[in-house]
């Protein structure tokens, strides 16, 4: 999926139409939060609505057709579809050099409550502006606190509002097995971003992070999917667990990894049967004041494209 098809929902014509027509009917504070958090979410390209089907059920809301794309994309019959791509909050306890939402940046900040985000999703979905939700978040307090709030959003959508649209949740690195497993009961896809392929380079740009906190939730997701497949062979009505599998994202060009290094890691990830897609995101110079980062005039989009071709 190219960068053009991964535009954030906040830049869409549907969003602008919604803003102009319904802003007088909605809480202005919520709409202001929506604008900030949709903008903050745009740097994450690792979302896709392909790979799952949720058929409408009696008394339920909507349905998802497998094979459709991310944010703004097109179905095989030519129809344009959208996901609401948003963050729960862009506050973060981490100070990662490559991230626009890093703790030390002086940027507009916002946090949506669980009920506000659920209501927004349902409102947009009822008006046919979106096919589903791509939800990520900055980390506040600790990984489990943040992950629990993400799970509550998905759980309320599924159980309270009978939402049958697509849900992609970003699992928080360092989150507990219990919360990851609960998320898998309500999300179509879970993803944990590796971000920087080599741990020594991750430590250089994000000293508070490590690869263990990323790979551990990946293992939880894989184990949950494989166990669920076996259970469904024995028991017909076992609920599906992350039916669209998992994905991850790596930043390209922020550190010294070669294409060979990146593709070697991707190849090892694809050895796991639950890894559906590795996304590559050309580094965007958002924090030019940080001398640990390369001085790039523009993202390495050709390199990004070549990695997708090789992948």
Enumerate the predicted regions with their spans:
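Conserved C-terminal portion of the radical SAM core fold
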Residues: 194, 198, 213-289, 302-311
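Core AdoMet radical
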Residues: 102-117, 125-150, 156-177, 184-235, ...
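Conserved, mostly hydrophobic/aromatic
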Residues: 83, 96, 135, 192, ...
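Flexible, acidic/Gly-rich N-terminal and inter-domain linker regions that tether
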Residues: 2-91
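Local cysteine-cluster metal-coordination motifs and their immediate loop/turn environment
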Residues: 90-102
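Short, acidic/polar
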Residues: 114-121, 176-181, 258-267
């Amino acid at each position: 999926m190219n960068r053009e098809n991964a535009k954030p929902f906040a830049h869409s014509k549907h969003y602008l139409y919604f803003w102009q027509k319904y802003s007088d009917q909605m809480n202005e504070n919520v709409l202001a939060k929506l604008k900030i958090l949709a903008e903050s979410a745009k740097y994450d390209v690792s979302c896709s609505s392909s790979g799952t089907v949720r058929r409408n059920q009696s008394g339920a809301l909507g349905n998802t057709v497998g094979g459709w794309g991310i944010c703004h994309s097109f179905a095989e019959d030519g129809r344009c579809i959208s996901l609401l791509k948003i963050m729960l909050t862009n506050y973060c306890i981490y100070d990662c050099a490559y991230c626009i939402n890093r703790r030390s940046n002086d940027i507009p900040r916002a946090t949506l409550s669980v009920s506000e985000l659920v209501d927004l999703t349902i409102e947009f979905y009822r008006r046919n502006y979106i096919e589903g939700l791509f939800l990520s978040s900055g980390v506040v307090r600790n990984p489990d606190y943040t992950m629990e709030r993400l799970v509550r959003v998905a759980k309320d959508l599924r159980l309270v509002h009978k939402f049958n649209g697509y849900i992609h949740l970003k699992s928080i690195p360092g989150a507990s097995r219990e919360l990851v497993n609960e998320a898998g009961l309500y999300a179509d896809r879970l993803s944990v971003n590796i971000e920087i392929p080599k741990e020594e380079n991750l430590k250089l740009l994000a000293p508070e992070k490590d690869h263990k906190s990323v790979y551990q939730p990946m293992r939880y997701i894989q184990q949950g999917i494989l166990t669920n497949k076996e259970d469904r062979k024995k028991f017909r009505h076992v609920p599906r667990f992350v039916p669209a599998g998992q994905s991850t994202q790596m930043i390209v060009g922020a550190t010294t990894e070669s294409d060979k290094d990146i593709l070697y890691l991707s190849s090892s990830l694809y050895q796991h049967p639950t890894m559906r897609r590795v996304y590559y995101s050309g580094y965007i110079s958002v924090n030019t004041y940080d001398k640990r980062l390369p001085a790039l005039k523009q993202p390495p989009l050709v390199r990004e494209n070549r990695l997708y071709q090789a992948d």
